[in-house]
Amino acid sequence: MWGGILLLGVSGIYNIILANSKPVDLILQVHVDPPPPCSVTGSSVDFQTVNINDINGSNYRKDAGYTLSCPDRKADDLRMQLRGNTTTINGEKVVDVGGPGFGIRIENADNNSLFSIGENNWTPFNITSQPKLNAVPVKQSGAQLSGADFSGSLTMVVDYQ
């Protein structure tokens, strides 16, 4: 019995509020910051001449040696993405250099772990501790490589977190 009376009372209050409602204009403003104004320099790795038989995923490891500068950024917490043509070597996504069974593995220099490449892979970082990257030639297990010149490239994208 009490439940029915309470429900009826709430219903009556709702109708009173609804009868006295007044439309109000709501103004929403959104400010979207542009991407941070960053520049990247010194981002070229030249392996020079390597011996095909010595390519094992750790020989010929080189520092990617880039410098990232974002002087007019609005925040210190950024994120990085590497984009480019990739291939899969021994189950890992690496930079495609145009040779079958051959690629360049991008690594976190701190622990030589694979650095994720691709449009869905963002790595958060603070401008004071930027990711250090290595590049190392890799070949598919059992691949027979021929001598040739190879090259590959990546695009570094930096944005706010």
PLM regions with names:
Residues W2, Y14-Q161:
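Mature extracellular/passenger domains of Gram-negative fimbrial/pilin and adhesin proteins
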Residues M1-G9:
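Sec-dependent signal peptide recognition
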